[in-house]
């Protein structure tokens, strides 16, 4: 997918190097999560931060060349135990796949380290490949569970990259929802909404997208793929990742179509009342007023920033770390 283009760019330097080193494959361990957190009074799914997981890969001299760490959420939903089990299993698989994919970069990380030393660098000044995964539940009720994942990768170069992807579940069954599950007319409505914002912004001094777009453009259609959208308290959100429709400096952009605008198109079991239709970016939040004029306001929310502090409570599970040398 084009959303992975950022990570591919960050890895170009490492992949172009010829030398390589060796390190052992780490073993994986996990700390059982604390499942004592009670669901909400309304019987909705409840979440709490689960176990931390960290894996370190080291070169022969003991220097860390790759760090892979994650913090995951655990779901508590006894009212629908089968759905809870299905969702929890999928969440754990997402984390497992993350560490597996991260560790595939072991050879490139060693290569990057060896080249760093050859160029005169000191091992104590080396910055290892770093991969980090965390997530944040954004909607959890008796119909829908939507979780947004933040995946950071540093593979050498001037800066790392951040991608976000989502998981949407049917709260009754635990099934991973696709865009088709929302209703036949939903995809065209949300893409038309995104196109409207993009083209309007391009007519302003901000104009941070590459160019104007059409709804049937491949880049626009890619936002309909599973993982690139989620249901929030405000509506259905399309994720426009770094480098997809705008350069790295513009960060990640999100296009929300409100539940009110989706009324009659979004299947009833997934809808809520109200919501806000907007475009949120590092540049600000864009909306259309009653006259159809594009307006911009400042926003404290940046889709390209990983949650931290009050947004990410401290893990209740223990820290599970592994290393290899």
Model-predicted regions and their roles:
Residues 2-10:
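Sec-dependent signal peptide recognition
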Residues 21-325:
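Compositionally biased intrinsically disordered regions enriched in Thr/Gly
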Residues 15-19:
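C-terminal motif of bacterial Sec signal peptides marking the signal peptidase cleavage site
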